[in-house]
Amino acid sequence: MDAGGAVQFGSLLRKARKQRGLSQVELGGDRYSGSYISHLESGRRLASPEVIEFLSRRLGVSPLEWGTSPAGDTRSAAHDDAVEDLLVAERAWSDRDWGSAIAHSKQAAESAAASGDSTRHWEALYVMAQARFAAAEYAAAAELAEQLAEHQTARRFSVARAQALSLASIANRASDRLGWAIAFGARAVEAASAAPPIILSEALMALVSAMSEAGHPPAESRPFLDRLSQLAPRLTSDHSRGMIAWTLGAAAFVAGDPEAGLKYQAEAAKLLDQRRDLRLWLRFHSTAASWRLGAGITDGVPELLQTAAFGLQMVGNSYDMVELRQAEAKLALINGDAERARSMIQAVLDDPVTGGPEMALGQSQLLLAQCYQALGEADQARRQFAVAAMQLEVEGRLRAAVDAWRCSAGQPILTESLTRT
């Protein structure tokens, strides 16, 4: 099918679709998007034999009525479409245009499927999953990454499987499904056992971060942290070593070793490259401040928060802003301004976005309870600790939930879990 044939086919396709009263979305079903059908009807895309066969069955039309047949090979054209859209998607990714990256990677995946290129299909879907994660569509990113881990390309290549599982772990952690985050992180480490250091380190970081956030004892994550430390010298990128230092620092704070945590934070600050990922670099400042505050350390915190606040207001998402506001409220609380801290965190919870059901509310609820406690409102504090405990249980932060339940019963809190790495 040449360009002229594509236009003729598209016209006949549109006519057949309208005769049956179907929309473009309905015609595509769960296999092709409405935009892809639109491109076929306008002649901007060449229909592969597989597409022609699918559409003819959906519409009850013989391919011969369209002047074509499922026979014939247009795989090359579909392959070219996949390459083109994937290049555009990757460019959109670099420009932080997540919507375009998602749209073009989806089109690339459809073209790759039509051409029978399973590897390119996996690659396009992986770009889509990354773009959804960057756009803070964490649940959607997690679901797609889980599917990619079972893709035929992932079954052929352990590196592809490890990358998909790592992304599934990270996305599940971001969407507060910590049990799943740990499970996928463990599978990623297993899949990456013989992979290059950069792939294995990503899997290890996903696993230990999920374990720490879920409240697992430091001894359980120690073997994985040791492997991560041994991998760091084998990485050629300063930025990648900075990511490891960031992870090791957070683990040190969890283990009750703030001195080591500060050392790793200083190392990460030197190695992380803001040109590589500005949002990630800003989040490091925000979470570094949070870990210090959790250990009762205020030295350097105002400067860290100032840097984070300036940049995250421009490039951060709502999840980033919640983390930042929690740290700012914690600093106010430690500095003795409990009323200001309460006002700040209440504003987070009252906001329809930052206090919405898709957000992790447990940490904010816990901080609000601590504010009431500092203000001497004991009864309100106990009730709020109970609210926080129930939410933390739902999110899988079991150690923090136990602490909150203890406080609701008037017992002292044992640990602090107000940060996310």
What residue spans do the PLM features occupy?
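Short C-terminal boundary/hinge segments that cap the last helix of small helical domains
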Residues: 60-76
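DNA major-groove recognition helix of helix-turn-helix/homeodomain DNA-binding modules
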Residues: 48-65, 412
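A short, Lys/Arg-rich alpha-helix, primarily the initiator
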Residues: 1-19
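Amphipathic alpha-helical segments of tetratricopeptide repeats
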Residues: 106-113, 146-153, 186-196, 225-237, ...
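Short alpha-helical DNA-recognition segment
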Residues: 18-39, 106
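Single-residue signature of alpha-solenoid repeat helices
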Residues: 101, 141, 181, 220-221, ...
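Tandem amphipathic alpha-helical repeat scaffolds
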Residues: 83-96, 121-136, 160-177, 199-217, ...
